UniProtKB/Swiss-Prot annotation:
Pfam families: PRC (PF05239), RimM (PF01782). PANTHER family: RIBOSOME MATURATION FACTOR RIMM. It is found in: Cytoplasm. This is Ribosome maturation factor RimM. Belongs to the RimM family. GO terms for molecular function: ribosome binding. InterPro entries: PRC-brl_dom (IPR027275), PRC_barrel-like_sf (IPR011033), RimM (IPR011961), RimM_N (IPR002676), RimM_N_sf (IPR036976), Transl_B-barrel_sf (IPR009000). Gene3D superfamilies: PRC-barrel domain (2.30.30.240), RimM (2.40.30.60). One of its GO terms (biological process) is rRNA processing. Keywords: Chaperone, Cytoplasm, Ribosome biogenesis, rRNA processing. Binds ribosomal protein uS19. The keyword Cytoplasm applies. It comes from Bacillus cereus (strain G9842). Residues 96-170 form the PRC barrel domain.
Length: 171
């Protein structure tokens, strides 16, 4: 059985030439949305997958704008609003050591180097120079942890466990 990964959500159309506006959920939008790549649009029930070939990709504000082969006007892509864009597991490439896919990190438990449980990673933000991991704490506000070597000491994907060093002012 094929395992599918969500790489974006189609939130609207853009213009009249069949461009769609996507909120990206992929770690590598330039690679994932490269012209010629095949993506799959899934329905709400996640039971049917429509293969589409990317014919253009550009970034606009906080969105990725895509066009697909054979879909040349707004009327043809209107039906995709609200759909998810997915890729099968075999389209995920191998990563270098110390690099992880978002889906591998989200859901990991986070502990300090002293063993204190802080919470679970619920989201990854990419505001600039480095990613920021959002940790849902059992009580209180979410905690924001920069993904830098001085803070993230160890990532154990098999055990879904991340060990961090708490720098002054982080908590």
């Amino acid at each position: 059985m094929t395992k599918w990964f969500n790489v974006g959500k189609i939130v609207n159309t853009h213009g009249v030439r069949g461009e769609i506006r996507v909120i990206s959920r992929t770690d590598f939008p330039e690679e994932r949305y490269k012209v010629g790549n095949t993506l799959y649009i899934s329905n709400e029930k996640d039971t049917d997958y429509l293969p589409v070939k990317v014919t253009s990709h550009r970034q606009h504000k906080t969105f990725d704008l895509l066009t697909f082969e054979g879909y040349n006007n707004v009327d043809e892509v209107e039906k995709f609003k609200g759909s998810l864009i997915k890729v099968p597991e075999e389209q995920l490439g191998e990563l270098a050591e110390g690099e992880y896919y978002y889906h591998e990190i989200i859901g990991c438990s986070v502990v300090t180097e002293e063993g204190e449980a802080l919470g679970t990673i619920k989201e990854i933000l990419s505001p600039g120079a480095n990613d920021v991991w959002v940790i849902k704490r059992p009580k209180g506000q979410d905690l924001l942890i920069p993904y830098i070597d001085d803070v993230v000491l160890q990532v154990n994907i098999e055990n879904k466990l991340v060990t961090i060093h708490v720098m002054e002012g982080l908590l």
